[in-house]
């Protein structure tokens, strides 16, 4: 059954436009609460379920948080409020506190005027499709506030950030530290603003923290993992050894070398996997996505490490890991899942696993990646309006087929609709940069023209 509200990463949209409104979040909190009450058989009859609500630093988070907590309370569910906190911190605390669910109000890497919400189960993992469908069914039912004696209580969780900082540090080996390492940490003016730099500092690094002054409007603005050029400039300015950039909700990470070279999620997962293989600690294979560079897949093959591709989206990477009983997966955008360390993608913990590899071996990022000659890969995001279906458009199909014939076996083409924004993503990969750029531009322009024609009816 197709879902009405939930996409690949929860619910997301423009603040003030349905469904990112206080009214909807009130009803959503109530609906989730009713599903929790009906499904949790382990609670005693006189106990209420508890939900932890976290958020990033968007100005709209306060408004939506208030509506959501009211909905939970009306359903008879207790609420803990953490304040601004990274998405993976909420996933961790749900497990650590042994409560029934977590909610994160965030639009991740999107601009400040977007927002959204994602939920975590008591196991700290994304909700299954079946539960999201139950929630959507409950949303169609009228609200009926529980009797006053059964209303949920709301309180603030003290030291949520401190608990999470200690958890992050626990994933780094006790026998190593980061002394002598100068690190620039770009916090994207997001949920990691009061956490990421502290983790690195407490492990001994000389830390320069940038974009750690959120004002409600500057999240992801020309900073963080979506604007890596800012970190590249900071690295050179501060003569740092390495740079770390997270996104607005802290679930993805990119890294930059002292020379200013970018290392994406593909590269970082390869470094972690190669190091674990050297230690004899790699369990199973590695999960990537349809976007993973072909050179990385070939490099894993040379190392004898099994590799498989999931659809784009960290929930699909996580599902593939669980199916194969593997423990490491990544997207090139920087979502990296180390299942032996955490249940979800975590920017800080992923960066620590890379730093572990560097400190343990004495190698640099470049040293680890020397045997991976990346294929040129061009990604173009094409904005579209309405419900343009590129899959059934003959002109788009013809252009794609022409490109595939030109690239042959040395290239890949991927067209997909974004699950969170009105975009069609065009990815072309090949051995020759000029040819890769040419076909990416041509396919993107064909989509633009066909989408415009479909809107005008011509």
From Swiss-Prot:
Enzyme class: isomerase
Binding residue positions for Mg(2+): 108, 247, 249, 251
Reaction equations catalysed: alpha-D-glucosamine 1-phosphate = D-glucosamine 6-phosphate
PTM: Activated by phosphorylation.
GO molecular function terms listed in the Swiss-Prot or TrEMBL record: magnesium ion binding; phosphoglucosamine mutase activity; phosphomannomutase activity
Note on how the cofactor is bound: Binds 1 Mg(2+) ion per subunit.
EC number(s) recorded for this UniProt protein: 5.4.2.10
Needed co-factor(s): Mg(2+)
Cysteine disulfide partners in this protein: none
Keyword Endoplasmic reticulum in record: no
One biological process term in Gene Ontology: carbohydrate metabolic process
PANTHER family xref list: PHOSPHOGLUCOMUTASE (ALPHA-D-GLUCOSE-1,6-BISPHOSPHATE-DEPENDENT), PHOSPHOHEXOSE MUTASE
Family named by the database record: Belongs to the phosphohexose mutase family.
Role according to the record: Catalyzes the conversion of glucosamine-6-phosphate to glucosamine-1-phosphate.
Annotated protein name in UniProt: Phosphoglucosamine mutase
Taxonomic classification: Bacteria, Pseudomonadati, Pseudomonadota, Betaproteobacteria, Nitrosomonadales
């Amino acid at each position: 059954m197709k879902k009405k509200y939930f996409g690949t990463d929860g619910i997301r949209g423009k603040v003030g436009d349905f469904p990112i409104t206080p009214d909807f979040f009130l009803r959503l909190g109530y609906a989730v609460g009713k599903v929790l009450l009906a499904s949790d058989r382990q609670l005693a009859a006189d106990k209420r379920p508890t939900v932890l609500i976290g958020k990033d630093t968007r100005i709209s988070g306060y408004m939506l948080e208030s509506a959501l907590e009211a909905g939970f309370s009306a359903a008879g569910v207790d609420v803990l409020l953490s304040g601004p906190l990274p998405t993976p911190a909420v996933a961790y605390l749900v497990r650590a506190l042994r409560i029934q669910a977590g909610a994160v109000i965030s639009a991740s890497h999107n601009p400040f005027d977007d927002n959204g919400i994602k939920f975590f189960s008591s196991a700290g993992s994304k909700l299954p499709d079946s539960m999201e469908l139950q929630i959507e069914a409950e949303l169609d039912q009228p609200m009926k506030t529980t009797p006053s004696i059964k209303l949920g209580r709301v309180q603030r969780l003290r030291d949520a950030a401190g608990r999470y900082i200690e958890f992050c540090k626990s994933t780094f080996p006790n026998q190593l530290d980061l002394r002598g390492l100068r690190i620039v940490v770009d916090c994207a003016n997001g949920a990691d603003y009061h956490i990421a730099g502290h983790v690195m500092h407490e492990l001994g690094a000389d830390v320069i923290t940038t974009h750690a002054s959120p004002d409600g409007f500057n999240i992801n603005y020309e900073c963080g993992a979506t604007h890596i050029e800012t970190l590249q400039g900071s690295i050179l300015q501060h003569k740092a050894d390495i740079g770390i950039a997270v996104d607005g909700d802290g679930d993805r990470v990119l890294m930059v070398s002292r020379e200013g070279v970018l290392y994406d999620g593909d590269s970082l997962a390869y470094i972690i996997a190669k190091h674990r293989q050297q230690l004899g600690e790699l369990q199973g294979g590695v999960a990537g996505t349809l976007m993973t560079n072909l050179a990385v897949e070939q490099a894993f093959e040379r190392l004898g490490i099994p590799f498989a591709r999931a659809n784009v989206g960290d929930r699909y990477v996580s599902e593939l890991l669980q199916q194969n009983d593997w423990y490491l997966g990544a997207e090139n955008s920087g979502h990296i899942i180390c299942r032996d360390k955490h249940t979800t993608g975590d920017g800080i913990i992923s960066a620590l696993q890379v730093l572990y590899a560097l400190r343990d071996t004495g190698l640099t990022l470049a040293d680890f990646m020397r045997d991976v000659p990346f294929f040129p890969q061009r990604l173009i995001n094409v904005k579209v309006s309405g419900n343009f279906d590129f899959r059934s458009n003959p002109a788009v199909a013809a252009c794609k087929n022409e490109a595939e014939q030109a690239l042959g076996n040395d290239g890949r083409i991927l067209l997909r609709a974004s699950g969170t924004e009105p975009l069609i993503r065009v990815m072309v990969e090949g051995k020759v940069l000029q040819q890769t750029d040419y076909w990416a531009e041509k396919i993107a322009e064909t989509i633009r023209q066909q989408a415009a024609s479909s809107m005008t009816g011509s």
